[in-house]
Curated annotation (Swiss-Prot):
GO biological process: translation
Gene that this sequence comes from: rpl36
Keyword list, A-Z: Chloroplast, Plastid, Ribonucleoprotein, Ribosomal protein
Sequence similarity: Belongs to the bacterial ribosomal protein bL36 family.
Stated name of the protein: Large ribosomal subunit protein bL36c
Species this chain originates from: Phaeodactylum tricornutum (strain CCAP 1055/1)
Amino acid sequence: MKVRPSVKKMCDKCRVIKRHGKIMVICSNPKHKQRQG
């Protein structure tokens, strides 16, 4: 899980979702998981 000021899709399988008011990226590749800090 990467915590970043700006989250971006890193590949075609990445999906940007909003969970508990936080913007997150979920993907089949675990390296692409991101959360906005």
